[in-house]
Amino acid sequence: MSATGPFSIGERVQLTDAKGRRYTMSLTPGAEFHTHRGSIAHDAVIGLEQGSVVKSSNGALFLVLRPLLVDYVMSMPRGPQVIYPKDAAQIVHEGDIFPGARVLEAGAGSGALTLSLLRAVGPAGQVISYEQRADHAEHARRNVSGCYGQPPDNWRLVVSDLADSELPDGSVDRAVLDMLAPWEVLDAVSRLLVAGGVLMVYVATVTQLSRIVEALRAKQCWTEPRAWETLQRGWNVVGLAVRPQHSMRGHTAFLVATRRLAPGAVAPAPLGRKREGRDG
């Protein structure tokens, strides 16, 4: 997606009406975009700068901007459930996904998290996404390619079980698991992740949360896992009339963070809790 300059042919743009409703279209010469508030000629948008306002055939005004990554993710065609921006942002931050990083992703889904990972690692980094289901992999491929215009050079999509990965030992800096049974691939992840590397796990249920945390502890090659969830609530602000919105984005998932220990190292047991196999 372009970031600056006038809108050009073939580019995706976002129209926002007076009620805040958003529409996305790809600019094609001679085409028209139809809404319930009238049509908008693509030719009227091509060549404009971002932040311009156009008028529909019915006289309605629309703000024209390039869609942000969050806009694209929330409007792109879905197959599997997407990872919401509030969780993707924390995965990138808590997982310390840095420019140039080699990131392993298990569970490409619809490609929502993949896009955030690709943005974070930049052109010098690499994202390797494993997806067992061919239909999910195709959804991810279409959505990622739709955002970039083509499959990015620094993205590798593998339709296979991560447990069967033939990647070299210690070949990734960070790993992210978004799958039903992440505990089943911990042996593969511990082999592939560098010492000190961060593992982030995304799970939806309390049962999954308990099982993955206990599995990490049992392996005894990870730091003590941290687990949390995030609830997001918007606020309405009009002068001094400030109040929370009636609806909120509540539970979407639990996130778990841990780091790979050096071979043979044993982390100190957390105070206040005995660890089976370490403290007797």
UniProtKB/Swiss-Prot annotation:
Pfam families: GCD14, TrmI-like_N. Contains a large catalytic C-terminal domain that binds S-adenosyl-L-methionine and a smaller N-terminal domain that may play a role in tRNA recognition. Domains are connected by a linker region. Catalyzes the S-adenosyl-L-methionine-dependent formation of N(1)-methyladenine at position 58 (m1A58) in tRNA. The keyword Magnesium does not apply. GO terms for biological process: tRNA methylation; tRNA processing. The gene is trmI. GO terms for molecular function: tRNA (adenine(58)-N1)-methyltransferase activity. S-adenosyl-L-methionine binds at S110, G111, A112, L113, E131, H136, D161, D178. PROSITE patterns: SAM_TRM61 (PS51620). It catalyses: adenosine(58) in tRNA + S-adenosyl-L-methionine = N(1)-methyladenosine(58) in tRNA + S-adenosyl-L-homocysteine + H(+). It is an enzyme of class 2 (transferase). GO terms for cellular component: plasma membrane; tRNA (m1A) methyltransferase complex. Signal peptide: none annotated. InterPro entries: SAM-dependent_MTases_sf, TRM61_C, tRNA_MeTrfase_Gcd14. The keyword Membrane does not apply. Keywords: Methyltransferase, S-adenosyl-L-methionine, Transferase, tRNA processing. Its EC number is 2.1.1.220. Belongs to the class I-like SAM-binding methyltransferase superfamily. TRM61 family. Homotetramer composed of a dimer of dimers. This is tRNA (adenine(58)-N(1))-methyltransferase TrmI. Inhibited by Mg(2+).
